[in-house]
Amino acid sequence: MASRLQRQLQLLSAHLVVALVALVVIGGATRVMQAGLACPDWPLCYGSFLPGRQMNLQVFLEWFHRLDAFVVGIGMLVLATTAVLQRQHLPRWLPWLSGACLVLVAFQGALGALTVTLLLPAAIVTAHLATALLLVMLVSVCHQLLEAGAVPIAAEAPARSSGGPERPAGGLVPGPGSGSRQTAPPWWPWLAGLATLLVAGQSLLGGLMATQWAASLCFSAGSGCAWLAAHRFAATPAALGVLLLAVLTAVSPGWCRQQRPLTATAALLVIGQIGLGVSSLRLQLSVPGVTIAHQLGAALLLAILAALTCRGWLARALTSGPQPMSAPAPTPRTVLSPSPAEVVHG
């Protein structure tokens, strides 16, 4: 039952990552299309669940953004409730992590309400984006932990009694085919974590620039250009961090080979982000699709980097955990040869 339930929650967490990335992108599209106040009330839109007569592109974006947020909230509630009710069959970290994500979803909903009722204040909109990106990373980590083969607490005693591997802190043991004899290089999780922090900071800086409408003001009136310059300056270390991680992973043997598909994807996303960022500036933000694609790339990049960081630390934890004690070797017995007297006297 435990493994089946865990596989179901793993699938649910994967769908939640996709839904959260879509939520970030739709929220960005809502801002780009200036549709943040297309629905003047909250949580309904024009007093109904589906505003048929008022429906246009802007209303649809805001309405669909709220619908996606509602779906994410329901999915997170199912994950957290199942983790608590079935905690004896699941890893002990899952109720805490899923509960924290559920609290963040509730906080995110409150921020969404404030963005409408307070008429889009920049600080609230930025906090709304920051919470969404944090949720993307946390749920991505949750999915990786579930995928890694976390075993229920009840399975710990049989594993120990049968001479199996003892479970390190956090309720994890290397599962079959998990490459338990290989581990991440010591530098790998640190570099992945640094790249994640740099990209997260760059994404927040981009969100601050967007909520201040700094790029538009810089192009039209020559004001607010400091935000634009800061965003361009911070893009360099973020891009170099991801590309360095991808290059070192490509040339490193062992465990790193399994991470090459994701690190290569992250590197391609960074290259695409550079192209989209340059294009949006050259087009002076006149093509909404380019800006929205830029936000999609940032959300996907954060989800992948969070997953890679989790994999790195998890691999280190699994191989550095307490090792099972082997049984002492039997003491060889000394066989004494019979003395001549014993031979004579029988």
Whereabouts are the PLM-identified features?
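Polytopic transmembrane helical bundles with strong interfacial aromatic enrichment
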Residues: 1-161, 166-168, 172, 177-346
